[in-house]
Amino acid sequence: MIIDLYLKGELVIVIGGGDEGMLKIRSLLTQDCKILLFSEESNKEIEKYVKQKKITFEKKKISNLDFLEKYKPIMIMGTTDDKELNRKIYQKAKDMNCHGYAVDDPMISDFSHPSLINIENIVQIAISTQGKSTIMAKKFRIEAEKIFKKVIKKEDLNYIRIHEYARSMAKTKIPTPNERREFMYSLMDDKNLKQNLKTGKLGDAKTRIKVLFDLWVKPYGVYANSN
């Protein structure tokens, strides 16, 4: 079972800045979480993310894990090239009552790390072999990515971008979840809105949503589909 853990605003600690560590950090960058990296060495990619203020980095040789106790992370990931150290990192996470992950030992970890198809940091599709074969998971991801990038259209991505705007508006005056859901589905059928989303005119799309919303909530009125 694949679970999408909600990490927004939470602290995730990654220990180890090699290839595996950077792979995990790239995935975390899409989650709008706080990323704290500890590694013995830096590299150009780490320096770039630090300069962009996407991660916090501390150059540190790990000999004792007690320094972690001053933090309150939701997750600690051991991504070093030392299997025993990664296991200790996982156990430290358990002692601190947070999720733990050891990169080369997924069977003892709280979760396996799936191979992700990431489309414009909006849609993520996970492919997992439950830690049994990362090579095959990567193979499937590469093949599936070509298909999904054809299936998921530009207007679909733009609809996701403005979805929160429409949903927040709906919550102000549409009283029940079922009615709000009905309103949200109705937006997908509006030709003017679809054209705005297709051409990337998100400002015009929001204006159109406001018009449709006003029609929907008009006292004693009936939603007028002006397609």
Regions found by a protein language model. Name each.
Residues 18-20, 83-84, 131:
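Residue-level detector of alpha-helix initiation sites
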Residues 23, 31-49:
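NAD(P)-binding Rossmann-fold cofactor-contacting core
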Residues 75-82, 86-113:
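ADP-ribose/adenylate-binding Rossmann-like module
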Residues 129-227:
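An accessory alpha-helical subdomain
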